[in-house]
Amino acid sequence: MAIQNGLRNRILFLVIFMKFYNREKELNYLKNYVQLEPNSILFVYGPKSSGKSTVMLRVIEELSKKDDLVFFYYDLREYATPTKEEFLEIFFEKGDKKYLLNRFEINLKIFKFGIEEKFDFDNIKLNDVFSKMKESINAVIKDGKKPILIIDELQKLKSIYFNGEGKGDKSLLNELFNLFVHLTKVRHLCHVICLTSDTLFIEEIYRNSTLENTSEYYLIDWLRKESIRNILKEEGFSEEEVDYCLKYLSLPYEISQLINNKKLGLSVEQTIKQWINIERDKILYLISTQKEFEMGKLIDALKLFENKIKVDIKEIIRDNLMDEVKFLIKNEILFYDVMNGIIKPTSVKKWYAIKEVIE
């Protein structure tokens, strides 16, 4: 129930705030993409809180009005580490049909894979799981509709294994990729879209030879400055306030928080200074308490961003700081744009916090 309530809250947030965030480019790309013939797995990636899920949910909201599209949407962010049992509970709904409306989200028309009431989850094999998924997808196609499978934070399934029937345990995630290639590249049956902010996971996928020529990547990055300017002007911020904010804002939630704080009587300078102080203290705590690296080496990695917000991966490799940078990526201080070979802070305000750390 908590999972469904969380999704409902995000939909409500979407309806209220999406008008603020000009994501027409990303929205149109994804709306057009899901209406093409399936031919590859699409990985939608970007910094944490850049709006990936919000854009994807808007795509579902707008296109689910069409009778020829069926969206299977699964959000794994509610779980720190889902178990095998939780995976089955999230992905399947017991009932008398091969695909069923999510009963908690009927208005949005999100579906789940259907499975018969008597099916025994306790003794299910991985091949059985995939057979049931394919049955659901084929049922959608038989009804003259196009299935679209969307998984938010897919990497959370990394730790789940199924018994391999005498051949050792099988990684759910690895086997899912094989299934996704079959559904997209081989049979062109179903779109598969995976959303993630874990760019080390994206790097693994990108380097995985078995997924070569079977995957595409789409970046949903920071908001564009012109979009931020238009939003703030619409909300009644003065030109001076807007110019100040443009130096520091980059993510959608920052805008809504700034708007709320202004209504509560806080100036934009107060709000932004608080943000930077909090981010600075988080970074200092992280690098001073971890035991894996020398603190000086982590500071050296951060110093690469002293005078620029983006650093080419080649510079990091040349300075022999890749392990330290990966640690900072894992802890959401830095973001790795794998497709473009660029490392940058996860947000602009994080960059200013980094600059204070290395002063």
UniProtKB/Swiss-Prot annotation:
Reading the lineage from the top rank, the first entry is Archaea
- Species assigned in the record: Methanocaldococcus jannaschii (strain ATCC 43067 / DSM 2661 / JAL-1 / JCM 10045 / NBRC 100440)
Q: What Pfam families does the record point to?
A: ATPase_2, MJ1010-like_2nd
**SMART domains xrefs:** AAA
Q: Which family does it belong to?
A: Belongs to the archaeal ATPase family.
Could you tell me which PANTHER family the record lists for this protein?
A: AAA+ ATPASE DOMAIN-CONTAINING PROTEIN, YALI0E33429P
**What is the protein name stated in its UniProt record?**
Uncharacterized ATP-binding protein MJ1006
UniProt binding sites for ATP: G46, P47, K48, S49, S50, G51, K52, S53
Instruction: List, alphabetically, the InterPro entries matched.
Output: AAA+_ATPase (IPR003593), Archaeal_ATPase_domain (IPR051667), ATPase_dom (IPR011579), MJ1010-like_2nd (IPR049081), P-loop_NTPase (IPR027417), WH-like_DNA-bd_sf (IPR036388)
Output the Gene Ontology terms for molecular function. Answer: ATP binding; ATP hydrolysis activity
Keyword set for this entry?
Answer: ATP-binding, Nucleotide-binding
